[in-house]
């Protein structure tokens, strides 16, 4: 949300989105190639078992093919589930949740149940996530679990909330996102009040029922609806808050919980802002060090100096770019938002470096694409509702309501604590200024009575610093910590075989990694070669022959150009899906 809470480096927590987009494109590439007689197969796309609406015994859901193109291409089925608006009144007003599943592919007698995923946010669509991630999940899990995800209440297709319109979001995001004068601060406060008033007007019913505790209650209804006695769950980033609250409220309903990239279990707002700011500072320093040591990095040998110079230039003279909605201006605040987004995923470090070095060439388009990943802006200028939901959840969870005076004092302390990003994060403690009172704030995290839980923490995680995973492990009272020594946000499905094998073993039979297990960063986890090589590599991983993968990617780049190709990947542009399918069919036929 653009407001006094809006740090130019983002607070929403969404894992490895670019990798998910690539996985989705790879799925389309494989399917398109197979449709033209190619021999390549992807076992995770095997024909589904059972009838189209089949579920586990006791399931109350009616499953049917998804209508979304990407979900349908991934072989997902969709359903809706009614849940109470207020979990404390189960017979009261109901709302609808949108669910999706990918059916298990192994023998019927080997099925364990459903494995539910949440991608984080708050505000992340689980259905969009599953459409991309299903093909990345280890085969051993796909053989034995129905993979299930959902759009949490208020998000995506689940009774979506909406606070302000697209034009107002554009206007607020072009304002000053890190106010440093009284006039700028008052404008930011006015923007926040406009946002809150919009939530009250457009989504009054959900305004008081968007807390994580409410979502945890929905998760238990999903468990019941799919017919499972106990829950198997993987939560990334903010999804760890859902999982930890679930384990605290329903410890006897837990089978296996993986919490990857934990949020803080109990930090006060100011402490949370400082910890996250330090996480981004550490990862920015890692980006700079890796860049300076790599001759392929466009910012080498002085990445820090170039970043500072470009930021200063944009503060004085923003770069204007034309898009379908008109003229957009890339200033220093949106530049920091784009840079912060890039720090989430080492996959895009090379692209970000090239964009910064050529900001007045084609780079601004790529920087906008990175910033738009966080704000939810689509290529046509519309917005999804992720930022609306993110703000509503954050303030529904937070019991405190700051005063402006306390916020000013906190801003000074935050700025002093963060030498590199202090002004960017300074006003984060005022995120819930003037919000309605929280009806159902976060409960105390304590799951000592639950079965063992697996927490995964990444040393170089900017958005959910490693120490939060340590704190979550201690707070749960029943958890084991697995450490990934790399950079980026979260580790499962991106941290290599060491992480994936440990998580898979735990989900299959409850086997925890040994106390103190640390997985080393993959040798190729950081590359400044750009998206082309990364995409080819992932296409090969998913089942395309090397020659075909290179043919598809190079054909797409040749058609639209490298900068536009990277932009389309970063923005999940639907036109790129058609381009990839076209070249997949051509390359499968030897064209």
Predicted regions and their residues:
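Catalytic-loop region of hydrolases
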Residues: 2-4, 13-14, 19-22, 34-177, ...
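C-terminal motif of bacterial Sec signal peptides marking the signal peptidase cleavage site
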Residues: 29-33
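Catalytic histidine neighborhood in serine/cysteine hydrolases
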Residues: 99, 476-490
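A catalytic-pocket lid/entrance helix-loop region that shapes and gates access to the active site
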Residues: 162-174, 245-306, 354-369, 373-378
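Alpha/beta-hydrolase fold nucleophile elbow
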Residues: 228-238
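Alpha/beta-hydrolase fold active-site neighborhood
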Residues: 304-451, 495, 563, 567-571
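Conserved alpha/beta-hydrolase "acid-adjacent" motif
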Residues: 462-467
């Amino acid at each position: 949300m653009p407001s006094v809470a809006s740090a130019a480096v983002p607070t929403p927590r969404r894992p490895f989105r670019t990798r998910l987009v690539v996985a989705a494109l790879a799925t389309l590439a494989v399917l398109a190639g197979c449709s033209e007689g190619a021999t390549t197969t992807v076992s995770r796309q095997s024909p589904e078992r059972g009838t189209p609406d089949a579920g586990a015994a006791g399931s109350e859901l009616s499953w049917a093919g998804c209508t979304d193109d990407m979900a349908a291409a991934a072989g997902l089925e969709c359903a809706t589930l009614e849940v109470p608006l207020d979990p404390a009144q189960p017979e009261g007003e109901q709302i609808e949740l949108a669910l999706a599943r990918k059916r298990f592919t192994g023998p019927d007698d080997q099925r364990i149940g459903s494995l539910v995923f949440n991608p984080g946010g708050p505000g992340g669509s689980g259905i969009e996530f599953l459409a991309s991630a299903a093909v990345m999940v280890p085969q051993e899990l796909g053989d034995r679990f129905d993979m299930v995800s959902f759009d949490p209440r208020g998000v995506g297709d689940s009774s979506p909330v909406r606070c302000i319109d697209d034009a107002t979001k554009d206007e607020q995001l072009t304002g000053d996102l890190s106010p440093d004068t009284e006039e700028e601060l008052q404008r930011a406060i006015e923007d926040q009040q406009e946002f809150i008033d919009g939530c009250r007007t457009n989504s009054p019913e959900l305004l008081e029922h968007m807390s994580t505790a409410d979502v945890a209650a929905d998760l238990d209804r999903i468990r019941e609806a799919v017919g499972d006695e106990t829950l198997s769950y993987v939560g990334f980033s903010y999804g760890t808050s859902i999982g930890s609250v679930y384990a605290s409220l329903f410890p006897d309903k837990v089978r296996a919980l993986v919490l990857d990239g934990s949020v803080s279990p109990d930090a006060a707002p100011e402490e949370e802002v400082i910890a996250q700011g330090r996480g981004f500072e550490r990862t920015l320093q890692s980006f700079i060090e890796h860049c300076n040591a790599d001759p392929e990095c466009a910012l080498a040998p002085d990445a820090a100096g170039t970043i500072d110079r470009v930021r200063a230039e944009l503060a004085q003279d923003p770069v204007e770019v034309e898009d379908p909605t008109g003229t957009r201006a890339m200033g220093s605040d949106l530049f920091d938002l784009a840079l912060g987004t890039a720090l989430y995923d080492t996959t895009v470090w090379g692209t970000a470096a090239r964009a910064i070095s050529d900001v007045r060439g084609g780079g601004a388009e790529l920087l906008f694409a990175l910033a738009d990943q966080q704000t939810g802006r689509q290529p046509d200028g519309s917005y999804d509702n992720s930022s609306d939901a993110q703000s509503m959840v954050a303030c529904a969870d937070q019991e405190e309501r700051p005063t402006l005076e306390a916020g000013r004092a906190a801003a000074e302390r935050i700025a002093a604590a963060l030498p590199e990003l202090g002004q960017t994060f300074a006003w984060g403690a005022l995120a819930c200024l003037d919000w309605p009172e929280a009806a159902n704030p976060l409960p105390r995290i304590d799951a000592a009575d639950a079965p063992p839980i697996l927490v995964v923490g990444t040393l170089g995680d900017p958005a959910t610093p490693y120490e939060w995973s340590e704190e979550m492990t201690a707070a749960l009272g029943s958890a084991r910590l697995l450490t990934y020594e790399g950079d980026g946000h979260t580790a499962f499905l991106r941290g290599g075989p060491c992480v994936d094998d440990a998580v898979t073993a735990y989900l299959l039979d409850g086997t925890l990694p040994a106390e103190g297990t640390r997985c080393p960063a993959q040798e190729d986890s950081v590359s400044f070669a750009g998206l082309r090589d990364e995409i080819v590599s992932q296409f090969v991983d998913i089942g395309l022959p090397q020659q075909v993968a290179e043919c598809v990617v190079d054909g797409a780049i040749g058609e639209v150009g490298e900068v536009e190709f990277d932009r389309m990947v970063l923005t999940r542009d639907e036109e790129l899906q058609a381009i990839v399918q076209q070249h997949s069919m051509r390359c499968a036929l030897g064209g």
